[in-house]
Swiss-Prot record:
UniProt organism field: Enterobacteria phage FSalpha (Bacteriophage FS-alpha)
One Gene Ontology MF term: DNA binding
Top-level taxon of origin: Viruses
Remaining remarks: Interacts with the polymerase and the uvsX and uvsY proteins.
Subunit structure and binding partners: Homodimer in the absence of DNA, monomer when binding DNA.
Protein name as it appears in the record: Single-stranded DNA-binding protein
Coiled-coil annotated spans: none
Gene it is expressed from: 32
Acyltransferase keyword on record: no
Family matches, as InterPro entries: NA-bd_OB-fold, Phage_T4_Gp32_ssDNA-bd_sf
Length: 48
């Protein structure tokens, strides 16, 4: 049913495709939740 028999083969193929770049740099466009002193987050969703 499936072409790949082991997850190691899949991981090797993904490493070859990605070039082991990973996510070392932070994305400036990524939205992050602001936390208060208690560690609770709050967000406002606005519909235009």
């Amino acid at each position: 049913m499936f072409k790949r028999k082991s997850t190691a083969e899949l991981a090797a193929q993904m490493a070859k495709l990605n070039g082991n770049k990973g996510f070392s740099s932070e994305d400036k466009g990524e939205w992050k939740l602001k936390l208060d002193n208690a560690g609770n987050g709050q967000a406002v969703i606005r519909f235009l």
